Swiss-Prot record:
Compositional bias segments (type: Acidic residues): 687-709
Composition bias, Basic and acidic residues: 675-686
Designated name of the protein: Non-structural protein 4
Annotated spans, Disordered: 1-26, 666-725
Signal peptide: none
Biased composition annotated in UniProt, kind: Polar residues: 7-16
Coiled-coil stretches: none
């Protein structure tokens, strides 16, 4: 084997069905343009860095075994707008630590119990008192023994009740000592003991119940609700809550969970000699705590404050399963999750120059895939990893079994990424989309895409730590207010990338011009640069002077408000944009190249430049565009609207007056007259018909005689011829 070769475990479930001896190892994937290239159990060669596996020949027929595992579908990792921050922060930064402590203090300030023990109530009868030595009784007298029979309810309600035995009377603020009177008698310093106990048990104030019906995490959701996604608010089974419970579960399992700065501040499970708080509920008595601190948390320490929140947010953990994860990962997750909310709320989302760090997609992809491949739980479920050919580029992917176990596998992956949020967030992670031929699986952390987007407070240039194969990247973080609109964001960033390219090319020689293109795999842009230093200096000068940025932004906004796609998006009143440019000063294929500076050879590291956030009022610009538009043509009326309205009224009245108008009563009377006339005509018609019938009956006889006479005369005339004949 050549130098740099290594052996890795096979991460696929056997060879493809169409594999033949000497054939291609690339596996076609339905729904994805390209193939899957799995790792091989015997790699014939790889790069020195191990970043890309090498294609290998197929094994002989004797090595081919039947596929025993279920079919797995490749899922590539995609970071959409809501899953990514273009800049991230340093966990050890003093300002970050201060904001985290401030955030948690604001949540728990009404629930913290002071270390005062001068008003504690000990329920001891005469026999119990006799068992105590004189020095102990004297110390109890110094604390203050209160007789319930001689005290009113108001006085008793503000006390912590210390009981040495559990009887039928349980007060909401009861501390029970399992060791009994003997334990109390053995204490060398009663007052100091209880002061220490109360210090390391952050409970509610004395005048309220010590049992948490609502945890501090619920208070955080209420106080900082706008920083959480709408479906996250009020829920308990999300990222932060589950991680805090995992922390207490580890402590309950005996794992050391401590502040990395103050290692003696640890959470541990209660021992039989520790006091246990009880509360009287509808269904009996409940333990409000299973955990205690080995030492009081250090004030103004953000991680100690996070441990306080974990303790006060814990419930009964008897039902929980084993948590197999290092507590440092969980502590990092809880701390950075709270820090993101704290920076967004108190820091207005802006990071100071010293607190700014670069982000990197490729690093996060590698971390997620490595976490999945090393997870024994996911391996048992059949989840593996592989390389997938997408658009002629090999990408690392997660292979998830398709079938009944699919949703179980996705849930397990979601849980793993939630627990490792702290590590991933160090590089900008806020969530991920797993894309397969069957669709998209969205894994979110519950943080709001608008209110938790971090930006730089000032423009800065720093070293870019990256594992990317791309040399030059342009990223933008665009937020629309008051409603986030994907169409406006996509259109504006496309227009801005075009204007950005024009401004750069206008400032450099023709041979140094760049061509900015949209990445086919994510929301970023990339470009090639023949002279990276020249391009980088030009961009830095653009940001420094501001003139080119003004022109670039102005033209992009003008085209945005007049775009047919966005002109109907009237719900967007303003837009905010941050730009980051990441560049390698040396091309990735020629990293040995050096630059001579002041007579010395010096390797330039990859750099990134981030701008502050620019905010533009779209509503005012939209109004101005509408006023200046050619479609906006005011019409000057010869008459006012009031005058025209009066003319319309007069026109109608004139038209009605020109007709023979009659009232409703006149119309009724006319109708009645017509009816009467009709009835009279009908009556006359009936009379005429009757008279005509009688006349016909009287004239019957005369008519017959007349007819006879006429017939006779005719016959006579016919019998006697006239003279002429």
């Amino acid at each position: 084997m050549s130098k740099g070769m290594e052996t890795v475990t096979s991460l696929v479930s056997g060879p493809p069905n169409n594999l033949k001896k000497g054939g291609n190892r690339n596996v076609p994937v339905a729904g994805i343009s390209g193939t899957i290239r799995p790792y091989s159990s015997i790699v014939s060669g790889s790069s020195a860095s191990g970043s890309a596996p090498v294609r290998v020949s197929a094994p002989g027929p004797q090595a081919v075994r039947p596929v025993s595992r279920p079919f797995t579908a490749p899922h590539t990792l995609h970071f959409s707008k809501g899953c990514w921050n273009i800049v991230t922060f340093n966990s050890s930064d003093a300002e970050t630590n201060r904001l985290v402590d401030l955030c948690i203090t604001d949540v728990i300030k009404d629930h913290a119990l002071t270390a005062k023990v001068d008003n504690m109530r000990f329920e001891l009868d005469e026999n119990d008192l006799k068992k105590l030595s004189a020095p102990v009784r004297e110390k109890l007298s110094n604390i203050g023994i209160i007789d319930p029979a001689n005290s009113d309810s108001a006085e008793l309600s503000g006390l912590v009740v210390v009981k040495t035995k559990l009887d039928s009377v349980i007060y909401p603020n009861t501390m029970f000592l399992p060791g009994g009177v003997g334990f109390l008698a053995s204490l060398p310093d009663v007052s100091g003991y209880f002061a220490e106990v109360l210090e390391r048990m952050p409970v509610q104030t004395l005048n309220s119940s010590l049992y948490y019906e609502r945890t501090w995490i619920d208070g955080m959701f209420e106080k900082f609700g706008k920083n959480f996604a709408s479906n996250e608010h009020g829920k308990r089974n999300k990222t932060l809550t589950s991680v805090l419970r995992d922390i207490t579960t580890l402590a309950d399992q005996g794992v050391t969970v401590a502040c990395p700065i103050h290692s003696d501040v640890m959470l541990r499970s209660l021992s039989p000699s520790d006091p246990v708080y009880y509360a009287k509920g509808d269904q009996g008595c409940f333990k409000s705590h299973r955990m205690v601190f080995t030492k009081a948390p250090v004030s103004k320490c953000g991680i100690c404050s996070t441990l306080k929140m974990a303790l006060a947010s814990s419930m009964n953990v008897d039902w929980r399963s084993q948590v197999n994860i290092h507590p440092a990962r969980l502590m990092s997750t809880a701390y950075r999750y709270v820090a993101t909310v704290a920076i967004a709320h108190y820091g207005k989302n802006r990071l100071a120059e010293s607190n700014i760090r670069s982000t990197d997609h490729a690093t996060v992809v590698n971390m997620i895939v490595d976490m999945v491949s090393k997870s024994t739980e996911l391996t048992a479920l059949g989840v593996t990893v592989a390389n997938v050919n997408v658009r002629s580029r090999y990408r690392r992917a997660i292979m998830i079994p398709v079938g009944e176990s699919y949703h179980i596998c996705v849930t397990a992956i979601t849980t793993l990424l939630a627990r490792c949020f702290g590590e991933l967030n160090e590089w900008g992670y806020l969530g991920v989309d797993l894309i397969s031929q069957n669709g998209r699986v969205q894994i979110r952390t519950g943080l709001d895409v608008v209110n938790c987007s971090l930006v730089a407070g000032v423009p800065v240039t720093k070293k870019w730590n990256t594992a990317s194969t791309m040399d030059n990247i342009l990223e933008m973080k665009t937020i629309t207010y008051p409603i986030y609109n994907d169409a406006v964001v996509e259109t504006f960033e496309t227009l801005l990338a075009q204007q950005f390219e024009r401004e750069i090319n206008a400032a450099v020689a023709r041979d140094d011009c760049v061509n900015i293109k949209k990445n086919g795999e994510d929301e970023r842009y990339n470009f090639k640069a023949k002279s990276p230093e020249i391009i980088y200096r030009s961009i830095r000068q653009m940001v420094k002077a501001g003139t080119s940025m003004t022109k670039m932004m102005g033209e992009a906004i003008e085209r945005l408000v007049s775009s047919e796609r966005t002109e109907g998006m009237r719900s967007v009143n303003s837009i905010a944009i941050s730009i980051i440019v990441k560049m390698r000063m040396e091309k990735s294929k020629d990293k040995s190249k050096t630059q001579i500076t002041s007579g010395e050879e010096k390797k330039l590291p990859p750099l990134f430049l981030i701008t502050p956030q620019y905010e533009i009022n779209l509503a005012e610009i939209r109004k101005a565009v509408e006023r200046s538009s050619k479609d906006f043509v005011p019409i000057k009326m010869e008459k006012t609207a009031e005058e025209t309205s009066k003319d319309i009224e007069n026109h109608v009245l004139k038209s009605l007056n020109a007709q023979a108008s009659m009232s409703w009563a006149d119309e009724v009377e006319m109708f009645d007259n017509e009816e009467n006339q009709k009835q009279e005509l009908d009556a006359k018609s009936d009379d005429v018909e009757e008279s005509s019938v009688e006349g016909e009956e009287d004239d019957d006889g005369s008519s017959a005689s007349e007819e006879t006479d006429t017939y006779s005369n005719d016959n006579a005339a016919a019998a006697s011829p006239t003279k002429d004949e």
